[in-house]
């Protein structure tokens, strides 16, 4: 019964293309939610006893310590379903009562439709004019990794491509994909140094998380390699400011930074490009124009367009 419920929840998340499943302990029960775009949807309630068994099942298949219920843990696995597997990442932490919360990130590696205000992916490919650093920014689950891999397939299909990720989210047969493992010294910094010895035409670095990663990404870009990476920021200008906070100098940014693509998921609207202009000249008006176009085309409701415009003004 436990496995049947677990499979049902993962299958539902996959079918709905949810980014995350949340298992949250409340006062008298557990509640399960899923996130699709910016919307968090209630799924179902479970008794404590049932959900404790379900969480233990997920922890076991992900190689986590089933007996540890208070300290935070991370895990990942390919979860088997009837028609294949779903790659998932897990994060747990216990509350003050000893009940665990669980978040499952579903890694969708299938090809997704990307709708842009310009003429689709080939047009964006033309903007990859020179070697250096290209950054993809936006909220969690907005499709940054999907876009990076789509561009890699479109622009570097017959070239040497390597990726460094934590974990590998989209499996590609035509690139060498490396996965972080701090326990055996496979850190971002060490793997970037190793990757440069392979002389890749494109190096995909999953995420700029801290000063160490930021410095390593800049060093890789300075060698003349084309580098793709993601970063969390609230705007294109916010990307620039975030890099400065992480210790990257303005002079280094002027040398290596070739472009920034900001994106976020709009309910009903697909993945929409925010800006491909020079990061120092970006204006939020471009985003507002796109919101108007999406509403006029019927992809999103007018109220949603107005709400998104308010966010970015």
Language-model segments: residues:
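Short, flexible helix-loop junctions that flank or precede catalytic/ligand sites
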Residues: 1-313
């Amino acid at each position: 019964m436990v496995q049947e419920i677990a499979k049902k929840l993962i299958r539902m998340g996959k079918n709905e293309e949810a980014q995350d499943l949340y298992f949250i302990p409340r006062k008298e029960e557990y509640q399960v939610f899923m996130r699709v775009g910016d919307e968090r949807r209630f799924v179902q309630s479970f008794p404590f006893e049932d959900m404790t068994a379900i969480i233990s099942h997920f922890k076991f298949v992900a190689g986590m310590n089933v007996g540890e219920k208070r300290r935070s843990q991370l895990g990942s696995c390919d979860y088997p379903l009837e028609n294949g597997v779903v790659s998932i990442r897990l994060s747990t932490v216990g509350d003050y009562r000893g009940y665990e919360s669980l978040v499952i990130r579903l890694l969708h590696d299938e090809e997704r439709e990307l709708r842009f205000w310009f003429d689709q992916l080939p047009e964006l490919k033309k903007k990859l004019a020179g070697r250096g650093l290209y950054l993809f920014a936006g909220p969690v689950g907005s499709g940054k990794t999907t876009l990076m891999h789509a561009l890699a397939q479109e622009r570097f299909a017959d070239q040497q491509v390597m990726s460094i990720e934590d974990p590998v989210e989209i499996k590609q047969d035509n690139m060498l994909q490396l996965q972080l493992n701090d326990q055996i010294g496979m850190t971002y910094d060490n793997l970037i140094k190793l990757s440069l010895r392979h002389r890749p035409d494109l190096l995909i670095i999953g995420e700029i998380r801290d000063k160490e990663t930021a410095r390593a990404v800049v060093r890789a870009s300075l060698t003349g390699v084309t580098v793709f990476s993601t970063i969390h920021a609230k705007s294109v200008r916010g990307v620039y400011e975030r890099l400065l906070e992480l210790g990257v100098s303005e002079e280094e940014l002027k040398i290596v930074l070739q472009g920034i693509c900001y994106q976020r998921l709009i309910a009903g609207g697909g993945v929409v490009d925010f800006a491909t202009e020079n990061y120092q000249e970006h204006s939020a008006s471009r985003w507002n124009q796109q919101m108007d176009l999406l509403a006029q085309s019927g992809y999103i409701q007018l109220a949603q367009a107005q709400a998104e415009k308010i966010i970015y003004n």
